Structures are given as structure tokens and as C-alpha cells.
Amino acid sequence: IISEGNVEVNSVLIFPVDQEKPELARALEPTLGDIPKPVIISREEWGAEEPKNSYSYHPYFDRLTLHHAACCSADDLEEGKAQVYWIQDFHQNGRGWNDIGYHFLVDRAGNIYQGRPETVIGAHVGGANTGNIGVCLLGCYHPPEVSCFQTITPESRQSIVELFSWVSDTYGQSPTVLLGHRDYFGTTACPGDNIWIELPIFRAEISDFIQSYFEMPPISIFQSPYPNPFSSQITLSFD
């Protein structure tokens, strides 16, 4: 869990003096992708506090990042709600941030929680938050640390794959851009060795999940003059 970050300049937009610049202080509209949105526990459901200030919105999307909380393990929905609320409280009142730093959090039962709206800039990779959607696994996955020896559950894995597949499809990102927190500046062990070693597998599984929606076999339609070839009623069979 790191600092909200330093000032970062990712791009400069220049407009002619007689041209009105586009409004960047609003959410980019998601596209209508083919991948269904997974079930996500809303902020209202886990009792989120309001952000302290207005959000800043992503001007584009080009990064995906996986974290671990390095604490706050949760094995069911009620534990997950409590831990997500604790993390928000720590980020807002311990770190002094605007809101919880992550966009999504996933517990060990596979429940997915909404953090900040994914259309707004988070606070999860200092110096690389713009365009970056961050997901945090509740728990601790770095074995050298005391009480930090967890491995990912099948339920968490499935939710991570489905969540990043939906995010990739909806916001036009390739699964190949998925990184662990440590891959940016090397100043942290996050997401822990037990998760970081899984990243190539995650990228492949997310790609396969997305591809499966574009390779579904076509539906064949057969017209059958049943029961009477001279009847106006037609029976259609779908294979």
C-alpha cells in the first residue's frame, strides 16, 4: 500500500485558440463489449465512505495492475466487506488520500468489490496511475514475510480472470499489459512472489477467456415443414 504518488505528466494536449478543448473532467464512456460484467459488490453494499474530494478521470486506458493487500485476508463476503472498509479507512485517514486506492478488490472466496470507479484515476502505483486500472487481492502472498504465505484460491483465480477479461474488453486493453505492482519501479514486493509468478498464466488465461467469446460456433437454423408441409406453421430447430 503505497503513497498516492508524485505529480506525473503523461501527455500535453494543444488546441488552436479558436477551438474549444474537449471536456476531460468526466468519465470516458465504456464500449459495449462481448464479455459479460462479473457480479461486483457495490460501494453501497460494503458501506463505503464518500470520497473526500472530486475525482480526476482517466483520459485514456493503457495499463492493468495486480496487487496484494499484504494484509486483510477474507474468506467470505462479510469478512471481505469489513476488510475493504478497513482499507478505505486506512487510505483516507491513515494516508490522507481521497478514497480507497484500488478500483477493484477480490477476496479468497472470489467475491469482487468495487473500489474507486474504474473510470477515475486511482492511487495504487505512484507515478503510473493515469490510464491504469488496479485490482487488489485481499491477503498476503509474499512467503519471505512472516504470516504472508498464502497462495491464490481457485475462486480468486477465476474472478481475477473474469474481471480482467471484462475490463480488457470494455476499455480496449490487451491482457498483455497486465503487470504486477513491482514491475513498474521495483520498489515493492507487491503482489508477492506467490502471485507475481502467476502473472504469465493470468495473461494467457485472460486472453483465452476473451478469445472464447469470438470463437463460439455459429447457430444453424433448419426449416422443417412439420407437421403439415402445407400448413402456415413452421418449426425451427436450433443446433
Q: Where on the chain are the PLM-derived regions?
A:
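Short beta-strand-plus-loop segments that form exposed binding edges in beta-rich domains
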Residues: 1-6
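Short secondary-structure junction motifs
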Residues: 99-101, 173-175, 233
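Active-site acidic/histidine clusters and adjacent loop/turn architecture
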Residues: 58-94
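Glycine-centered coil/turn sites that cap beta-strands in beta-rich domains
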Residues: 214-239
